[in-house]
Each structure stands twice: as C-alpha cells, then as structure tokens.
From Swiss-Prot:
Functional note: Capsid protein (CA) is the structural component of the virus-like particle (VLP), forming the shell that encapsulates the retrotransposons dimeric RNA genome. The particles are assembled from trimer-clustered units and there are holes in the capsid shells that allow for the diffusion of macromolecules. CA also has nucleocapsid-like chaperone activity, promoting primer tRNA(i)-Met annealing to the multipartite primer-binding site (PBS), dimerization of Ty1 RNA and initiation of reverse transcription.
Extra remark beyond the main annotation: Retrotransposons are mobile genetic entities that are able to replicate via an RNA intermediate and a reverse transcription step. In contrast to retroviruses, retrotransposons are non-infectious, lack an envelope and remain intracellular. Ty1 retrotransposons belong to the copia elements (pseudoviridae).
Protein's recorded name: Transposon Ty1-JR2 Gag-Pol polyprotein
Swiss-Prot/TrEMBL GO biological process terms: DNA integration; DNA recombination; proteolysis; transposition; viral translational frameshifting
Marked site (Cleavage) residue numbers: H401, N402, N582, N583, A1217, A1218
Motif (Bipartite nuclear localization signal): 1178-1212
Gene3D superfamilies documented for this protein: Ribonuclease H-like superfamily/Ribonuclease H
Region (Integrase-type zinc finger-like): 583-640
GO molecular function, one term: DNA binding
PROSITE patterns xrefs: ASP_PROTEASE, INTEGRASE
Length: 1755
C-alpha cells in the first residue's frame, strides 16, 4: 500500500517535509521542556552543514548509505525517516531529493498501518488550520514567526490565520523502539509547539493552557499514530490506549510528569555524590539535607543502602571530620544514623558547646525505632550518561532535559525515562558519581579505576581471551572456580572470585549470553571480542557498531580515549549479591601452612614460583594444598618491598637463539659483582656467579679481590666440579670485557682447556642479561634476607649462598622444572632448611667448666656444602661454624619486630615441618664426638675480625596488641613477649653511601608519602602503596587517634663549627656560635602555613601572589606595593614547573603504616624533610632487653677466643664528647721547613730555587733593619720569656715562584710579651664580596696591589730577641728585634695601625665605621688584607693616584691594574675572579683546588661516577663509641683537620651550598670513625668533581637607582644533637649571593616557629651592618628585605598580640624581632618553601632539589 501511494504521486518531489522552512519556536511559560530557539537554529545549521558535505544524487541513480534513507523509487521502502537523531534538523531545498521524507498534508501520502484507521480520522483539507507542505519544491517559502502566545481565540480566527499564511514544520521522527519513547515524546512535543499547538500541551500541574478543539484532537490522534507505531509503544502507553485509544493527552501528561520526576532524581543523585562538610554549618542542617535526599530517592524507587550512603557521606568529609573515613574498616555495618552521631560529637566538641546544648546522641532503642531504611531492596534506576556536551545550556533544568543529538541504545528499564539525551552533569572530581552509573555498592567501590575509563561501559579487548568484570550485579548463575588461572599481559596472576554468565539484551530485542569471570583486581571491565565471536557477534570499527554476521546492528560502539567501549545498559542485571560472589570459594585452611611463612622460608620467592615448584615436586615434604594461599593474593612483604625495590623491569629475550642448541653445562654465563665496601678483611668483597644456559643451574663463589690468580682458582674449581659431577665439558663461557676476564692468564687457561670465551660488546649489559639478572636477583635476595633477619652486613655472602640453594630448587614458570631437576638432581628437602637468620642454640662441646652453659646462641645461615650440618653464625665468638648440634630456638621471629610480623607465629609450623628431620637426627645420634662442632672451612667467614667496631645494643620494642587484635591473640602476644628474645647484633661496619652525609639520628620523623612499585613483594599483583615511617619511638600500642592528632615533623640536620681568622665586626645575638633552625617538610610546611593559623596569632595572612611569594607590610612600612614586589624580582630563585596536587584514593589512606628502618651511614640529618621514607634501624643485639640470654665474658676462655686478635691498647672516643670538644679547624700546612726545602731536598733544581729565595729574604730583612745588627746578646743574659724562637718557611706559589719567609714562633710566645687587647684586623669576607658586587653594578675599575714585606714596615714597641738566621752560624747568640716580624702576636696589629695611619693622613682615606680594613673617600674604596690591597673606583686615574702615594712609602707591586675592557682575571685572597666591567663577574677556585686536593692523599676517582650532590637525606652518623689506638686516633684527627680545613676555606669563600655538610663534619673532627672519614672523602670528592663550579654574578639593571639587600632565612627544628636546631641564612645584594651561614642554634628551641624566629634574629644584625656598609660605599638609597617560608613567624612580626607567647625566651626574641623589623624598615616577605634557596644551609637535600635550588647561582 505504501509503495502504491508513492507511485501515484511520483510527480511530487519527495523532499523533506520541512524543506527550506525557517520557523521560530513558540515559547510557553508553562512548557516544562523549554528549549531555546538558539538551540533549534544551531541544530538546523549543524544539519545543513553536515548534509552539504554529502553528495547529492538523483532519486533514480543511487541508494543512500544510511539504511533508513530508502529511495522513493523503491517499492519496498519503509516509512520515510530522515536518518538517525543527529540529522533530524531542517534541510535545505537542494538536500531534499535524496531524502525519503514524503510531504505531509496530502491524505494519501500519510503512511499508517490499518490499526491506525479510526472513525474519527479525516484528512485535513486545504482550509485546515494545521501546517501544510509545499506543492512545489522550487517555491521558496518564508513563514513569519508566530507570536509568543499559544492561546487561540476561536476556530474561525485560527482558520483565517492559517489560510492567509501557510506554515510548514518539521515532523517528528518515527518511533523505532520502546526504550526510545521518552526521547521521542520530547521531539513530538516540540513538533506540537512548532505547529501552534503549545497551548494544548499539559503543564507541570497536568492541565493544558486552553481547551483542545476537535480538529486539534483529530490532528493529535493521527500524528501520534503515524509516528508512534503500536509495536514500539511502551507497556504503560499501551495500557492507556487499551482503555481509550484517543486519550493522547493522558499519555503526554504522564510523560511530562515522569520527566519532572527524573530531573529531581538526577539532581538528588548528583547532590548526594558531591556532598561536602567541614563543620562550617551546623551538623543538624547537614543531617537534614542528607536524610531528605535519601528519603526522596527511596520514595522514587531508587534505594540507597546504608553502606553506600555512609561511603558517600564520608567521602565528602574534610578537616577534623576526615578521619571518620577510616571507621568503615572498624565498623563494617555502620548505619547512617550512627555516622551522624560521630559527626555531631565532633561538631559539638569543635564548637565547645557540649554543656550548653542538649546531647544529640540517641539511645540504641531510638535507633531501632527509626523508620528510615537504607537497604537496597529493589533494582536501582539506570541513569545513562551522554558523552556529548551542549555548551549553550542556560539552566540546570535545561541541561537535564535537553533534546538529544544522538541515537542512544535501549535501556533495560522500560518504565523509566532514560536520560541518555541529557548533558552530563560535571562533578567535582573523578571519584564522583556520574549520570549513567548505578548508585550501588559496586559503583562506590569501583568508580573510575582508571583516569581514561568511560563509566558505565565495557572495554572491547581483542587480545583478551576471557571476559572479566568487577561488578557482581550482572553475573548470572555464578559459581566458584578456584582452578582457573588468568594472567595479564605482564604474566601476573589475576585472582578470580567466580565464574558465571553475562547476559545481553540488544536493541533488536535479541538476547544472548557469554561466560564471564568476576574479579575486583582489574582496571577496566573487559569484554572479549573472541567470546563475542563465538556467539556470532562481531565489532565493526568502521561503522562503530556491534553486529551479527548477517549485518544486523545490535549496539553502537563508543570511542573514548584510545579505546572502544560498549554500554552496560545492554547487560541484564542479576539478583546475586556481592558478598555471595566474594565468598563463593572460601575454603577451609585449617592446619595449613600460612603463605607468609612459606614465602619467608623459601628465600622470599614470589607466590607463582612457589606454586609451580610445589606442583612439580621440586620442593618435597608437602604439597600445594598444604599451604593457605588465601593471603597470597594481597600479601605485601615489607622486606621484599625494601630489598627488591627496582626502577624498571629488565628487558627479556636479549640472548642469541643459537645458545639453546647446547647441551647441559656446555654453555656458561659468568659475571663478577663487587666490591662491597666497609667490611672486615675476613669477609669477601666480591662474588663470581656462573649460570648454565640450558639448565639454569647457578653457582656462586666468594672473592676477596679481583686478581688474576683468584679468578683462575675459581675457574679451575667450577670446571673440575662440572666434569666430575655431571660428566660434561664446558665449551663456551660468556663474560663481559672486564680486565679480570680479558687478562692473558685466564685467556691461556681457557685456550688450554679448549674453551671458547664469548665476550660481550663493551657497555652492552643487555647482551649479558643472564648473568646480570642473576646478580641482581641474588642481591635483591641478599638485601631482603639481611633486612628480614637483622644480621650484620658482613654476612652478606651467606645470604647469597642461601638464595642460590633455594633458587636452584625452584621451578621456572617457563620450563616447569627447577634447575636441579634439569641437572638430574633430587629436589630440595625443605625439612632440612631453616629460615635465614633463624635463632638457634649451638652445643658447646668443650665448655670452660662443668658449671658453664653448654649452649651458644647463634643464627642459622645456610646448609653446609661439605657436611650434613648447617652453617651457623655465633655473634659471641664472632665466627661461623658448621655443625649439626643445634636446636631451633622457640618463640623467636628472626626479623619481624617492625613490620607487624609479631602477629604471625611460625613455631608450630616450623616444628611440624622439621619434625621428620629432627627425628631422623635424633635416631642417629648415638654419641657426639668432641669435634662435632666443626669450624667451617669457608675461609671467607670463619674468623670475623671486628676489632674497630663493637656490636651495638638497641632496645627492643615490645609489640602490644592493637585494638583490632582478637582476645586470643592478646594472650598469645603477651606470652610471646615474656619469652627470651634473641636478636642478631647490630651492623658493625655500616655501608657508606656515595652521596650522603649527616649527623647522628636522634628521633624518627614523619615521611612523605610516595608511590612504591612492588616488583617482587611476594604477592601476586602490583600495588602502589605509601611507605610510612613510624610516628615515634614509643610502643606501637598508642591509639590511632592520638597518633593522628600529633604533629610529627621532618627535621633536618646540619651543624657548623665556623672558623673565622678575621675579626667579624658584627654583634651576634645568639652567642659565639651562630646556629640554625629546624625545618618541616616542604609539603607539610605549605599545608600548615596556608591552611592553619599559627599558634601565636589567630589570623595569619593567607594570601599568596602569583609568584608564591607574599610581601607583608610591617606596621611601620610606608613603601608602595611595587617596592615590596621588587625585593624578589631578580633573586636567583628556582623556576618550578606547575604541579597539580597529588590526590591519593581512600584505599591508600586506609592502609596501615609499614614501619621501615634507617641504615646507619652517611650524612642525612635527623629526619630529613625531603626524604621520602625515613627508615629506622632494624639491626638487633643479643642484649636488647632484660629477658634475653646473656653470655658472660668469663664463659669463654682463651681457647674459645683463639680466632680473635689479642687485645691491644685502645682509645675510647664518645661521639657527643668529641663533638663538644671541637673548638677550631686546624688549617692545612702548605709550607716547608728549612730542612725539608734545603737540607734534605733531593730535587736539586727546586733546592737551588729555595736557596735563592732564602737569600732574597735575608737581604730584605737586612734592608728593612728588622733587627739591631750592631750588637749580639748572650742567651744567658736575656730573660727567656723575651726570647722568641724563629724559623724559615718555604712555599711555592701558584704562579710558580719560590718564596721564603723568616717568621717568629708566635704560637709559643709568652703572654707578657704582647698586648692582648690589640687586634690584627683584616678585611671581612662580606666586605670584600659587597665591594665586588657594587663594583660590578657601577662599572668600577678593580686594581690589585701587593706590599712586599708589609709587617717589616711596622716598628715593635716591646723588647724581644730572636736567634740569628742559620747561615750566620751564631747559635748561642741573640739579636734584638726592631720591626714586627711575621708570626709575632702583635705584628698584625702593628702593621694595621701603621698602614691605617698612612692611608688616613697621607692618602685622604677614612675607615668605614664597624668594618675594619675598609677605607674609602669620595672616589676610591680600598679593601686591605694584610699586605694585599684591592682598589675600586669609577675612574682609573683615582686608583693610580693612590698607588703613587703608596709607592712613596712602601714597596708596592701592581698585580693587576684592571684597565682592560675585556675579561680580566684576578686572584684575590684565594678567589679566582673573572671580571668584565658592566657585564658579569665569576668567582671560583678551580686552579687552586686542582693543585691542593691531590696533595691531601684522598682516594679520588676522576674517571668514576660523579657525585650529584654533597649528601643525601635519610642516612645518619653512627653514635657508637669508637675504639682506636692512640697513634691511629691522632693520625686520623690530623687528617680530618686537613680535609675539613680545606673544605671550610672553599665553603666560606664562595661555595655556600656546601656549608651545611662542612659544618656537620667539622663537629666530628675528634670522632674520626671510618664512617665519618668516608663521608669526608665523599665531600672532598664532590668538591673535586665540581671544582670548576663558579659563583656567577650579572650586572643588575634596577628600575630605580637603589640598592637592594635581602636575606633569605630558614631553619630545621631540633635536628642536631641535644635537640638543637639548625639555622641558615643567605645574603644577596642586588640579586647576587654575597654570603651565607649555616650554624647550630645556641639555645634549644621548643617549636618550629621559635626556631625560625631564632634564625631571623641571627640574620638581622649582619643585615644591618651590611646595609650601613653599602650606604657608606654607595650613596644610593637601599631597600632591605627579609624572606622566610614561615607564615607563623611573619604573623608574629606583624601582630600586636603578646598574650600567646609561651615563655619569656620566646617572647623576648619575638619582641626584639618586631623592634628590629620595624626600626630598620625591613620588608618581610613570604617565600614558598620549594623556592627557598636557604634550604641548602639547614638540611641535606635530594639531588634534584639540591640542583634546583643552586643551579641559578652556582654553576
């Protein structure tokens, strides 16, 4: 019938029914679906643009690609449609032809089915008021916009209006599915509005604006039946039509009511998902709001259970309410009412109104009577999510009900109004719920596992062989199947909870199902295309649809990110609950070995390898079923996390394929590891490993060195072993090109035995992957075993040996066999194996007497190679033994005290495991001979020499049961604690890191959270977990709430003992030692400053500028804001990249802290703030607590101690006493005595030069009339006190000249021979740096002078005598001094007064008050350092005039006039300066360091790896008492004095970034332990590696002619011994660093704020003095700034409140600081911690941070 109608009217152009019609929609105030006209116009424009890109074809030529666009010439064409929803906009005239729409208005052209025929129906005629369609496509139509009102006056007026102007509108699309009915109703209502029928549409209250006429009712009925076929109507619509088939108005009214209801539901869901509460509003109001939402959703059929509601509420809690999030683990069945009780309690406590307000808490009986229910009893409503977003929505209602622009797939709920056409509601973060997700427990637990996941969709995976889903709500017929093994792309096991069916209901009303696996341990829900293909469903990515083989489209595919997704709305939900799924395969594990015990027993191998080994019987005695694997899924071994931590996975498959063709033991891989430093001489420093290519069997051999003969012995041993044991001959050995393998000796040996050496390419470690990976694996195991057992590091090779034995017995997942099985050996009997470090008692077969103990405490290492015994370490004898006479010590976990292992008791498991072996031993033990306690023949560990160090005792912490421990566990724990506790001795020789230095550790600290990648944690999956250090050293039974409330901070250590050989004209407020203050971690400091008010002031400033630096005006500051901002304008602060805040999901916050340990070595401060993990020592001592077994000294006689060296006289040095005794740093002696330079000098040429210098000096002394040559005095006649010893010293200068100097021994001069009040002044280094900086900024000329024999120009007042020079040969005579000889106490002061008088009186200079040796006049500035002068002037002639006057009195030499405009090089007071006027200045010491450092006899490594920083955080100087021989001690102290003396000289000259490390080591000069010496060597090595670094200055270009002096201050709280704080200050002049200080605070500070105040108060005096100096030298105005990262300190400075000062010291410091800031017009500014370059002065920093803070001024 339809085809006939089309053929009858073939002369009519079959264009769009709305062709070239432009109409504005009529807005009705009562319209609940108000869509703006702009959207309609945009839709029309978008459609026009899209269709204009299509090729226009004649009606008879082609068939459109869209199956819905049937050609009008085709007899089988369906009801005309204008394509899918996105193209249902109005079309132009040229685009009408290919479309299938027939025009509306002709009765025969209306396609309808017979059921639509009704007696009421009649076709609209030409006079009808309804819109007509054009009779000719070529006639352009223009319809004026109707008026805004929709009310018709009467039918006649309507007729006249429609007659005068014909209106053509776009018809609605055809309804094609019941699920699309809600969307279709919206377009149908829009169609009625455009047809001037908006007034008949029911409003919100269900009533239309006006009455409907009969014609309108007929039009409504017919159009509804035409475009809404009955087979596609929802059930509820059919029910209405079955009663009255003309009641279209009721259908519209009910549809609008559903739309309004769904809008409120969507808003409630969004509000519930975005709850936020921090206590700013009353708790009552918050509870009322939440309960109203939940009740409203429950009434609408969307039921929210208690658990989901509690999770949503707790997720929005912040501030002090945030800790309630953790209650979900303590109370699994918490209700909303209970949660609000806790919220009310915190709110009342916060408001302090518990006594004034009635208690809100309800009785339990009230809770039982609560009528509200939050259980989920019905299926949750599905709310689809539309990924397309409309940008011009104007209201929330409009967004929720916007007309769709896409054809969405069907929903599973036919009775609900789908929101697939709505714009997605944007929530606050990725954890919030979105429209389209089910508000269920599964949604809350699995929302957004990945950032690129499309919520509510399945990921189509072509590589997955199985379908996996996280939610159990879609699994039908679920059943347990624990035998299924599923691995991911990285071959890691994925635990499976259950298997079931996944049922689909596609849009063609077909149903199908596939198998699905349930697991919560995946990032996406995966839909396998392979399983879909098995049910005849394929994915077409060109059309982006799922379809059958016959082309039937089932569902659309969405491309989101890099993946393709299909909506979950096609899944049929099941009625199975999550707990059912999660518990379906819970198995009985009674009497099974716990997995952590087996994991530790088998050398911390991973679970997969252990299961393979048990399945293939490579581990005997028990089966796989004897192990409880339930904990293996989520088990995280802390020791594995630390011991096996790695950066990335090794690249596999790097070996050549031909290697697989070799027979067993014909192709070996070998490699050498080492050296391991800081071990006793008897312990090996290297090991060499061998791996067979075919069987993967491994051997390891210890080495003490890498000499040729040592390597040859090992090769001879391994070849003989393989030949005799396996009857095989080695053909090829693959090795790297190390010298130990390429030497001629080994090459001849291999050639003699017919073995081909296969060398890898140089620096190609991947080609040597087998050996390299084995070494890495063994080292991981070694670190883990030592970490777990707590044994000292010198037993490292025993851990390697133990790991090798175990790994040879573990099956390979690839070959399914172990190396022993491949080699034809029996499996390892685990009953003969003990955990590494297992405490045992060894029988003493030869005690000293019959009453002495017969048992010796020891620790099991590994099975013996040479007997049936076990290698056991005996700490009391400091050796290892090979014996079978041992008993396992019960109740002793070898190394579990800090990782919560104490809750695991393996005694019973160990007894069961070793029962058969022990019975075998017992049955065969008839009589034990005296030599049964056989000493091990392993020469590498038989006798451990530990004489320089002694084992340390560390107090063990008793682990008390926590709140979550069951009562039974409490009892067991208490019993276990009461037993004796054997602990391994603490490490004697701690490892020294290459890049860490710092003082002894006093306390633990709060670390920063970081992501740790578990690469071998013993579990079966990878998890990012934060490692948290212990909050304190107290027992672990402290309450969790108390631990949260405490504010534990990072502290960072530095110390300084500053040596200043010049007078410092600055009065220090903190005593003689300048100290520095503690520092909180960078992130914690920012949080506390920004989000909390300081304890001193209730309202600190909180505003930050765009540069993260906040200038804060003091009360007396009157400068403008731009002046304050200019303070930080040109400072050399680091450029920080923008960082987005890292947010950790709740599961990370809920993990219990894993306490880690601190390795005792290198400088790292006491709790560094930048250390990601602060680790506490886990080394144990046999004398840890009172209950442990004690071994008295008289128990062992000399026979037992024969392996130890005889006692020697030693000096015992205590760390604190040594640090407190340090007074000064002894400078390096770079000169030679007379006998060294001349008498015994074997270098003839050098000797002649020194003789020449000697005579030159003598002549100069005679010329200057240094002594009275007229009379010689007899020694007996002169008072010995007035006789000064003298000597000649010789030196070779850097320019190559040889110089001699006759000096007096002022160090032994009697006090009566000089005036102690006289001062020998020289220019202060800050004055020199200030003058140089001003010279650069003002284009000054710099002239350097030298006055020869300067001291000899000064007369001496006292009566002093010296011995004549040696060449005169008058040893018994004395001569009287007339001039100030070099070396006399008063010589410097005499010369200073002489030159000062001459400069003032003869040269017209004046000395700057407070700055000795700085002279100036209106044109010239002079800096005087003994006999060196540096002149600065704008005009070079001014310098020349001064030089001429100086030459008139003194022998003046011009070193550098400085007249060139090019770069000029100076050597001023040891500084090598490169200066180009008006451009830059560079200060360094490269040449000096290149000459001096090699003379220190420090082991330098010029070709090795360069250190990137002078020290690293996290490692500490050991406080153990030091025992050294007297001579050895003096020698090491002298060496430390030389090294620290040089480092101090460099640091205070220009390397201010090293001051913290220098000062810390300077405190340990009298404590020269091996660790301290190694740290000092590291510092010298770093100085050597960076000797070319320079302090860079550039000429400043200020906007105003002013000088800017800034000090940047920082402090580290309580990080020094005796809880002193470290303070640091850096001074900058016009953006150039001119000085720095890093010192220890003189007084103990009690808070971080107090430490910061102390640091600032220490900096202000010098700041003021420098300010005065600058104003004297340069008359420009000066701006003074003070920068700190402590907002609390700033608030104290600007506050007028004195009530909160906690004590007198703090108050006086703060008040003085206020006075200094206000009185000196200081601009106090806030600087972000990450940009605070003074951080390097107070703590050790990570490499990246250290470089970031220093690379702008030191490079």
């Amino acid at each position: 019938m339809e085809s006939q109608q089309l053929s009858q009217h073939s002369h009519i152009s079959h264009g769009s029914a709305c062709a070239s019609v432009t109409s504005k929609e009529v807005h009705t105030n009562q319209d609940p679906l108000d869509v703006s006209a702009s959207k309609t116009e945009e839709c029309e424009k978008a459609s026009t643009k899209a269709n204009s890109q299509q090729t226009t074809t004649p009606a008879s030529s082609a068939v459109p690609e869209n199956p819905h666009h049937a050609s009008p010439q085709t007899a089988q064409s369906h009801s005309p449609q204008n394509g899918p929803y996105p193209q249902q906009c109005m079309m132009t005239q040229n685009q009408a032809n290919p479309s299938g729409w027939s025009f509306y208005g002709h009765p025969s052209m209306i396609p309808y089915t017979p059921y639509q025929m009704s007696p009421m129906y009649f076709p609209p005629g030409p006079q009808s008021q309804f819109p007509q369609y054009p009779s000719s496509v070529g006639t352009p139509l223009s319809t004026p916009s109707p008026e805004s009102g929709n009310t018709f006056t009467d039918s006649s007026s309507a007729d006249s209006d429609m007659t005068s102007t014909k209106k053509y509108v776009r018809p609605p699309p055809m309804l094609t599915s019941p699920n699309d009915f809600p969307n279709w109703v919206k377009t149908y209502i829009k169609f009625l509005q455009n047809s001037n029928l908006g007034g008949i549409i029911p409003t919100v209250n269900g009533k239309p604006v006006r009455q409907i006429t009969d014609d309108e009712l007929t039009f409504l009925y017919n159009t509804f039946q035409i475009f809404a076929p009955s087979q596609f109507l929802p059930t509820w619509v059919k029910d209405i039509l079955s009663v009255d088939y003309t009641d279209i108005m009721k259908i519209l009214s009910k549809s609008i009511e559903k739309m309004q209801s769904d809008t409120q539901e969507a808003n409630d869901i969004v509000t519930l998902a975005n709850l936020q509460y921090n206590g700013s509003t009353p708790a009552d109001a918050f509870e009322t709001k939440v309960t109203n939402i939940i009740d409203r959703l429950n009434n609408n059929g969307i039921h929210i259970n208690n658990k989901v509601a509690c999770q949503l509420i707790m997720r929005g809690l912040s501030g002090e309410y945030k800790f309630l999030r953790y209650t979900r683990h303590r109370h699994l069945n918490m209700t909303v009412a209970e949660l609000f009780l806790d919220i009310h309690a915190i709110y009342e406590e916060q408001q302090g109104s518990r006594n004034s307000k009635p208690n809100y808490r309800r009785n339990p009986s009230d809770e039982k009577n609560d009528s509200r229910s939050y259980t989920n009893t019905t299926k949750p409503k599905v709310i689809a999510r539309n990924p397309q977003k409309t940008n011009n929505s104007k209201s929330k209602t409009a967004r929720a009900h916007n007309v769709s622009t896409s054809n969405n797939s069907p929903s599973t709920d036919n009775d609900s109004i789908s929101k697939s056409t709505t714009e997605p509601i944007q929530l606050n973060n990725k954890h919030d719920l979105h429209l389209g997700q089910k508000l269920t427990e599964s949604t809350v637990n699995h929302t957004n596992h990945s950032d690129d996941e499309l919520p509510g969709h399945l990921l189509l995976d072509s590589g997955a062989s199985r379908t996996l889903i996280r939610s159990a709500h879609h699994i039908h017929s679920a059943s347990s199947n624990p035998d299924i093994n599923v691995v991911d792309a990285q071959k890691r096991n994925i635990p499976i909870n259950a298997i079931g069916d996944l049922q689909f209901h596609f849009q063609d009303n077909t149903k199908t199902s596939i198998k699905v696996l349930h697991t919560p341990n995946i990032a996406y829900d995966l839909l396998s295309l392979n399983e879909l293909a098995a049910v005849d469903i394929t994915a077409c990515f060109t059309k982006n649809v799922l379809e059958r083989s016959d082309g039937t489209v089932l569902a659309p595919i969405v491309k989101y990110g890099d993946f393709y997704w299909v909506s979950k709305k096609y899944l049929l939900p099941s009625n199975i609950s999550v707990p059912t799924i999660n518990n379906v395969h819970t198995s009985e594990s009674t009497r099974k070995y716990p997995y952590p015990f087996i994991h530790r027993m088998l050398a911390h191998a991973n679970a997969q390898t252990i299961r393979y080994s048990l399945k293939n019987n490579t581990i005997t005695y028990f089966n796989e079923s004897d192990v409880d694997w339930s904990s293996a899924i989520d088990y995280q071994c802390p020791d594995c996390l630390i011991g096996k931590s790695t950066k990335h996975r090794h690249i596999k498959g790097s070996r050549l394929k031909y290697q697989n063709s070799y027979e067993p033991f014909q192709y070996l891989h070998t490699d050498i590891f080492g050296p391991v430093h800081n071990l006793p001489k008897s312990a090996p420093s290297y090991f060499i490993s061998f791996t067979d290519e075919t069987t993967k069997f491994r051997w390891v051999y210890p080495l003490h060195d890498r000499r040729e003969d040592s390597i040859l012995d090992v090769f001879t041993t391994i070849l003989a072993f393989i030949k005799n044991q396996f009857q095989a001959s080695v053909l090829v050995i693959q090795m790297d090109r190390g010298s130990e393998y390429t030497n001629r000796t080994l090459h001849k040996f291999l050639e003699k035995n017919g073995i081909t050496p296969c060398y890898t390419t140089t620096a190609d470690s991947r080609a040597h992957g087998v050996a390299e990976r084995l070494n890495r694996t063994l080292l991981d195991d070694c670190r883990t075993q030592l970490q777990c057992s707590g044994l000292p590091n010198h037993l490292w090779f025993s851990a390697i040996e133990f790991s090798t034995i175990v790994r040879n017995s573990l099956a390979s997942p690839k070959s399914k066999k172990s190396a022993r099985q491949h080699a034809g050996l029996a499996g390892l009997d685990i009953s003969t194996l003990l955990p590494f470090g297992q405490p045992v008692i060894v029988n003493d077969h030869n005690p000293n007497s019959k009453i002495h103990p017969r048992g010796i405490p020891g620790y099991a290492l590994h099975p013996s190679r040479n007997s049936y015994g076990y290698i056991i370490y005996l700490p009391s004898l400091k050796k290892t033994v090979d014996t079978t006479n041992y008993v396992i010590l019960q109740g002793k976990e070898s190394r579990l005290d800090q990782f919560n292992y104490d809750a695991l008791t393996f005694d019973e498991d160990l007894n069961r495991l070793t029962a058969s072996y022990q019975s075998f031993i017992a049955s065969n033990e008839i009589q034990q001979s005296d030599d049964l306690n056989i000493e091990s023949d392993h020469d590498f560990q038989s006798d451990i020499e530990l004489h320089p160090e002694q084992p340390r005792n560390v107090l063990s912490k008793a682990v008390s049961p926590t709140d979550s421990t069951p009562p039974s566990t409490h009892t067991e724990d208490s019993k276990r604690v009461s037993k004796t506790n054997i602990r391994a001795p603490r490490e004697v020789d701690p490892n020294i890191s290459e890049s860490n230095i710092l003082p002894s550790k006093k306390r633990s600290s709060t670390p920063q959270i970081s992501n740790i990648e578990s690469t071998g944690s013993g579990g079966m999956h990878k998890l990012n977990v934060p490692l948290l250090a212990p909050m304190s050293q107290s027992n672990t039974h402290e309450s969790s709430h108390a631990s949260k409330s405490k504010d534990f901070r990072h502290s960072d250590s530095y110390s300084e003992n500053e040596t200043n050989h010049t007078n410092v004209p600055i009065s220090s407020t903190g005593g003689t030692n300048n100290k520095t203050v503690p520092q909180i971690s960078d992130q914690e400091t920012e949080k506390r400053i920004i989000h909390r008010s300081p304890s001193i002031d209730a309202s600190p400033p909180e505003n930050n500028s765009s540069h993260n630096i906040v200038p804060i005006k003091t009360p007396t500051t009157v400068s403008e804001q731009n002046t304050e901002e200019s303070i930080i304008a040109d400072l050399p602060l680091p450029d920080l990249p923008p960082e987005s805040p890292t947010e950790f999901p709740d599961p990370f916050k809920e993990l219990p802290p894993i306490n880690s340990r601190q390795t005792n070595s290198s400088l790292g401060g006491i709790g560094d703030s930048n250390a990601y993990t602060t680790i506490n020592s886990k080394k144990r001592s046999l004398e840890d607590n009172e209950t442990e077994i004690k071994v008295s000294r008289d128990t062992w006689n000399t026979k037992n101690m024969r392996s130890l060296e005889p006692p020697r006289s030693k000096k015992r040095i205590h760390l604190i006493a040594a640090v407190k005794a340090v007074k000064s740093i002894k400078p390096i002696r770079t000169t030679l005595r007379y006998d060294e330079a001349i008498t015994y000098n074997k270098d003839i040429k050098e000797k002649e030069k020194y003789i020449e210098a000697y005579h030159k000096e003598v002549n100069q002394l005679l010329k200057m009339k240094t002594w009275d040559t007229d009379e010689y005095y007899d020694r007996k006649e002169i008072d010995p006190k007035r006789v000064i010893n003298s000597m000649f010293i010789f030196n070779k200068k850097r320019d190559g000249t040889h110089k001699a100097r006759f000096v007096a021994r002022g160090d032994i001069q009697h006090p009566d021979t000089y005036d102690s009040g006289m001062q020998s002044n020289t220019v202060h280094h800050y004055a020199l740096m200030t003058s140089l900086s001003l010279a650069l900024d003002n284009n000054y000329y710099i002239t350097q002078l030298d006055i020869s024999s300067a001291y000899l120009y000064a007369d001496i007042k006292e009566e002093l005598y010296i011995r004549p020079p040696p060449h005169l040969g008058m040893n018994d005579k004395l001569i009287r001094l007339k001039k100030s000889l070099y070396g006399l106490k008063q010589s410097g002061a005499n010369w200073y007064e002489t030159i000062k008088s001459y400069l003032i009186q003869q040269c017209g200079m004046e000395e700057v008050r407070g700055w000795s040796c700085v002279f100036k006049n209106s044109q010239v500035t002079i800096c005087l350092f003994v006999d060196d002068m540096v002149l600065f002037s704008k005009n070079l002639n001014s310098n020349k005039r001064i030089i001429e006057k100086l030459k008139m009195q003194y022998d003046t030499k011009i070193i550098n006039l400085g007249e060139s405009d090019e770069e000029i090089q100076y050597d001023i007071l040891g500084l090598e300066i490169k200066y180009q006027r008006g451009k830059y200045m560079k200060l360094g010491m490269e040449n000096s360091l290149t000459e001096k450092i090699p003379k220190l006899n420090v082991p330098l490594n010029p070709k090795g790896r360069k250190l990137s920083a002078p020290g690293q955080p996290g490692l500490y100087i050991d406080q153990q008492e030091l025992e050294l021989e007297e001579d050895d001690y003096k020698m090491k102290v002298h060496e430390m004095q030389k090294l620290i003396g040089l480092a101090s000289y460099v640091g205070y000259k220009f390397r201010f970034d090293l001051l913290y490390y220098i000062n810390t080591l300077a405190q340990h000069i009298l404590f020269p332990s091996k660790q301290v010496l190694d740290m000092t060597y590291e510092l010298i090595q770093f100085i050597w590696n960076t000797r070319d670094k320079q302090l860079i200055w550039h000429k400043s270009k200020p906007v105003k002619p002013t000088n800017k002096l800034v000090v940047i201050s920082d402090a580290s709280y309580g990080n020094q011994p005796y809880y002193k704080s470290q303070i640091g200050n850096i001074y900058l002049l016009n953006g150039k660093v001119i000085g720095g200080k890093s010192t220890k605070a003189s007084l103990t500070c009690t808070s971080t704020t107090e430490a910061e105040i102390h640091a600032i108060s220490e900096s202000v005096p010098l700041l003021n003095n420098l300010s005065y100096l600058i104003q004297e030298l340069d008359k420009k105005p000066i701006t003074k700034g003070l920068l700190t990262d402590s907002k609390s300190t700033i608030s104290i400075i600007i506050s007028n409140n004195e009530e909160k000062f906690r004590n007198r010291f703090f108050g006086t410091k703060a008040m003085r600081l206020r006075d200094e800031v206000s009185g000196n017009h200081l601009h106090v500014c806030y600087i972000e911690t990450k940009k605070n370059i003074a951080d390097v002065m107070t703590k050790p920093l990570p490499i990246k941070t250290f470089k970031l803070l220093t690379n702008k001024w030191i490079h």
